[in-house]
Amino acid sequence: MVSLNTNVAAMMTQRHLSQAADQNVESQRNLSSGYRINSASDDAAGLQISNTLHVQTRGIDVALRNAHDAYSVAQTAEGALHESSDILQRLRSLGLQAANGSHEQDDRKSLQQEVIALQDELDRVAITTTFADKNLFNGSYGSQSFHIGANANSISLALRNMRTHIPEMGGQHYLGDSLDKDWRVTRDNQQFAFEYQDNEGQAQSKVLTLKVGDNLEEVATYINAQQSVVDASVTQDHQLQFFTSTLNAPEGITWKGNFADEMDIGSGELVTVDDLDMSTVGGAQLAIGVVDAAIKYVDSHRSEIGGFQNRVSGTIDNLNTINRSVSESKGRIRDTDFARESTVMVRSQVLQDATTALLAQAKQRPSSALGLLS
């Protein structure tokens, strides 16, 4: 039916033109923003899920930065301990050199000058090693937590004091009376024993029977061969001395037996790397035990830090894997599929051009009614 008042064809064409235009605008918006979901009306459920995933990725990004910071702290600490270990190894070499009987007193004094310089350097490393203005080894660091999860997951790193004067950098020193250089073990002084508490608080004892006729050097060698609690050595003044770094009980060691009575071994005295004096044979021999204890302490802490580094490294790898998976999931939900959206936009443009041409024709349709009047 031809109608002058109602152009149905034009109205239908206009509606399709509007739909094509809306589709074209939506496609351009999706392509320009890079997102398939730009508002809740586009996909309410998808928007909620993608926002949840976005929050998770943001948390993982922060966790990764924290984990890298934690690894950097541990790496800095391990480097400082490596330097400390090298210094202690050099001190031990000097101790072995100074304990050699072929050296004169002046030689040992020269060695002691290097010892003093190394002591200062060891303290300098402990005092000046810092990360982000935090000192790592002067005893102030304590234990710090690093948040390495998307939520509130954390890992702690504890760094110890590495100054030369702390008890862990040495042990207890016991010194007996000076004896005659011709002293020998007799049946009257061959019994030797000592009692102590181990690190678990359990009472322990060692009982030794010395060989009659042995001199003081041979006694020290025999004592060292029979147990590992104390290191025995002889000073230049013919004094038997003992050093132990394995005991932390405040009571120390109780010496017993007629040999101990003759030695009149005094109470224990704390000796650390800060107290090293290699200008004498006895001091050099004592220094070897002290440095060995310090090396054990440093290496133990290096092992802890190495384990921490491995743990953080594994965490970083895991976080990267999770972050990649979550980002891919978020992208599939929210990001624009450019191939598909480009096709939709071209289709809507073609429809828009076609409906525009058809609308022009539809608008001419009422004029055909004039032909009926002529």
Swiss-Prot record:
Signal peptide: none annotated. Its main location: secreted. Pfam families: Flagellin_C, Flagellin_IN, Flagellin_N. One of its GO terms (molecular function) is structural molecule activity. Keywords: Bacterial flagellum, Coiled coil, Secreted. InterPro entries: Flagellin (IPR001492), Flagellin_C (IPR046358), Flagellin_C_sub2 (IPR042187), Flagellin_hook_IN_motif (IPR010810), Flagellin_N (IPR001029). The keyword Glycoprotein does not apply. Residues 102-126 form a coiled coil. The keyword Ribosomal protein does not apply. PANTHER family: FLAGELLIN. V.parahaemolyticus possesses two flagellar systems: a single polar flagellum propels the bacterium in liquid (swimming), while multiple lateral (peritrichous) flagella move the bacterium over surfaces (swarming). The polar flagellum is synthesized constitutively but lateral flagella are produced only under conditions in which the polar flagellum is not functional. Heteromer of multiple flagellin subunits including FlaA, FlaB/D, FlaC, FlaE and FlaF. This is Polar flagellin E. It comes from Vibrio parahaemolyticus serotype O3:K6 (strain RIMD 2210633). The lineage of its organism: Bacteria, Pseudomonadati, Pseudomonadota, Gammaproteobacteria, Vibrionales.
